[in-house]
Swiss-Prot record:
SMART domains: BON
Keyword terms of this UniProt record: Cell outer membrane, Lipoprotein, Membrane, Palmitate, Repeat, Signal
Known function: Plays an important role in maintaining outer membrane integrity.
Topology term for the membrane: Lipid-anchor
Compartment(s) where it occurs, according to its Swiss-Prot or TrEMBL record: Cell outer membrane
Signal peptide: 1-21
NCBIfam families (alphabetical): PRK11023.1
Name of the featured protein: Outer membrane lipoprotein DolP
Domain BON: 48-117, 126-193
Protein encoded by which gene: dolP
Source organism of this protein record: Haemophilus influenzae (strain ATCC 51907 / DSM 11121 / KW20 / Rd)
Lipidation residue positions, type S-diacylglycerol cysteine: C22
Length: 193
């Protein structure tokens, strides 16, 4: 059977498109494996923290006012939960703390929610970019291992979590504070010394 040049091109393009999905899956899987392998927490602890984040956000979202008017994200590191986002008033902020503390497995809650309107998608994107820049600078700087510090940004504020020494914490905060667009750096570390 002889294929026309047009059919050969169609088959080649189809195969290329199909294989691109495979490549993305392989690269994505490799990135996840690298993240898990370089994180100082055990794989089990990483899974526990991810599960805890989901459970806390789920518990908080059950409050009707938070669900309707707030934006709450939970970040967990070794069972210590950081709440970030926006809520309509201080009573709702307190409710979020109580709900988070009620989740099994939560050791401590750091409530950094702000009483303000929800941030825009544009700000969320800027925050994602800030996080990327901070992690990149830590990687290049060398005073603190980027894999030892979990970085999250919210409305221009950078939150740093992890188990580090005082000098590593200060170095991480110094690196983050020098990134353009960072309004404030908040350390949520457990100190090893």
């Amino acid at each position: 059977m002889t294929l026309s040049p047009l059919k050969k091109l169609a088959i080649l393009l189809g195969a290329t498109i199909f294989l691109q999905g495979c490549v993305a899956a392989v690269i994505g899987g490799g990135a996840v494996a690298a993240k898990v392998a370089t994180d100082p927490r055990t794989t089990g602890t990483q899974i526990d923290d991810e599960t805890l984040e989901f459970k806390v956000e789920n518990a908080v979202e059950k409050d009707a006012q938070i669900k309707a008017e707030g934006r709450v994200n939970a970040v967990s590191y070794n069972g210590r939960v950081l709440l970030i986002g926006q809520v309509p008033n201080s009573d709702v902020k307190d409710t979020a703390t109580a709900l988070a503390k009620g989740v099994e497995g939560v050791n401590e809650v750091y409530n950094e929610l702000t009483v303000s309107p929800k941030i825009s998608f544009a700000q969320i994107s800027k925050d994602s970019w800030l996080t990327t820049q901070v992690k990149s600078k830590m990687f290049v700087d060398g005073r603190v291992k980027a894999t030892d510090v979990k970085v999250i940004s919210e409305n221009g504020e950078v939150f740093l979590l992890g188990n580090v020494t005082q000098s590593q914490a200060n170095a991480a905060a110094d690196i983050a504070s020098k990134i353009s667009g960072v309004k404030k750096v908040i350390k949520v570390f457990k100190y090893l010394d």
